[in-house]
């Protein structure tokens, strides 16, 4: 079974021809969609469309626990998450790729943990993303001459609404990009000892910029971002070593009370 899982949206559709589709039943309900299993450049991978096959789940209703649990149950050890984000900084331009290294959680009512009792866990999130996967994707993006930022702080809001201008200006003080789907996905992967890397693609500037958003321009950028992400995945995934040496699973040794 695959040891690499991808969670993403339309930008990842069609990257491989599924060899198998697996319906996984979890203690947390059904995942967003059946898990598709196929190969990318000879490497077996599993894929879950985060928002569902027909984009039926808004960000605050995505079954995050079921998605992560399903991948873990299939034997996945590494999760590659792809998100579209808005930019909070001038230098993070539409069309850029950001390999996120930190996040701020501004969500409000999601299921954040697998441990709601009777067992209690406190997971360290000081460095929430896998250093080994981050290095591979940064190096590969540079090899491909893609516009990549090696670091970025992602602020995750509840959604599905977008920010007010006042909120956007406040968020600019703390973060570089803004989105709605990183949390609790990253927390949950860490609780199961899985490696997790986030590839964020910038579609536009958030409303702080006070520039009119051109819908056609956003669609054009999104299409270009899809091509960049697929190119990046196809080049980077074969470089991921079979054995994990990152220490991501070590957090399990100290998380339980």
Swiss-Prot record:
Site feature Important for substrate specificity, where: 163, 215
Could you tell me the keywords of this UniProt record? Answer: Disulfide bond, Glycosyltransferase, Purine salvage, Transferase
Please give the GO cellular component terms listed in this UniProt entry. Answer: cytosol
Pathway assigned to this chain's UniProt record = Amino-acid biosynthesis; L-methionine biosynthesis via salvage pathway; S-methyl-5-thio-alpha-D-ribose 1-phosphate from S-methyl-5'-thioadenosine (phosphorylase route): step 1/1
Q: Does the keyword Iron apply?
A: no
On temperature dependence, the record says: Optimum temperature is 125 degrees Celsius. Thermostable up to 137 degrees Celsius.
Tell me the PROSITE patterns matching this sequence: PNP_MTAP_2
**CDD domains, alphabetically?**
MTAP_SsMTAPII_like_MTIP (cd09010)
Could you tell me how activity relates to pH for this protein? Optimum pH is 7.4. Active from pH 5 to 10.
Q: Where does substrate bind?
A: 180, 204-206
Top EC group? transferase
- Which residues does the record give as phosphate binding sites? 10, 50-51, 181
Entry's EC annotation: 2.4.2.28
Domain of life, per lineage: Archaea
* Pfam families named in the record: PNP_UDP_1
GO terms, biological process: L-methionine salvage from methylthioadenosine; purine ribonucleoside salvage
Disulfide cross-links: 130-195, 246-248
Q: Which reaction does it catalyse?
A: S-methyl-5'-thioadenosine + phosphate = 5-(methylsulfanyl)-alpha-D-ribose 1-phosphate + adenine
Similarity remark: Belongs to the PNP/MTAP phosphorylase family. MTAP subfamily.
Per UniProt, subunit arrangement is:
Homohexamer. Dimer of a homotrimer.
Q: What protein name applies here?
A: S-methyl-5'-thioadenosine phosphorylase
Coding gene? mtnP
């Amino acid at each position: 079974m695959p040891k690499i899982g991808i969670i993403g949206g339309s930008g990842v559709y069609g990257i491989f021809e599924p060899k198998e589709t697996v319906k996984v039943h979890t203690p947390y309900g059904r995942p967003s969609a059946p898990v598709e299993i196929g190969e990318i450049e000879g490497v077996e991978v599993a894929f879950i469309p985060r928002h569902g096959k027909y984009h039926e789940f808004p960000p605050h209703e995505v079954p995050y626990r079921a998605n992560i649990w399903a991948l873990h149950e299939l034997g996945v050890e590494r999760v590659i998450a792809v998100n579209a984000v808005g930019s909070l900084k001038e230098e993070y331009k539409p069309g850029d790729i950001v390999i996120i290294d930190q996040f701020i959680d501004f969500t409000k009512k999601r299921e954040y943990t697998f441990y709601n009792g009777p067992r209690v866990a406190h997971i360290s999130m000081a460095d929430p993303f896998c250093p080994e996967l981050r290095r591979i994707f940064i190096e590969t993006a540079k090899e491909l001459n893609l516009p990549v930022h090696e670091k970025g702080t992602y602020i995750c809001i509840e959604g599905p609404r977008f920010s007010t201008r006042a909120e956007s200006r406040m968020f600019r003080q703390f973060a570089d990009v803004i989105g709605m789907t990183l949390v609790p996905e990253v927390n949950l992967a860490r609780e199961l000892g899985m490696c997790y890397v986030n590839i964020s693609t910038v579609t536009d500037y958030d409303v702080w910029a006070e520039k009119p958003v051109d819908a056609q321009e956003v669609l054009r950028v999104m299409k270009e971002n899809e091509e960049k992400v697929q190119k990046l995945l196809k080049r980077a995934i074969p470089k991921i070593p079979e054995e994990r040496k990152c220490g991501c699973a070590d957090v399990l040794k100290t998380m339980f009370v």
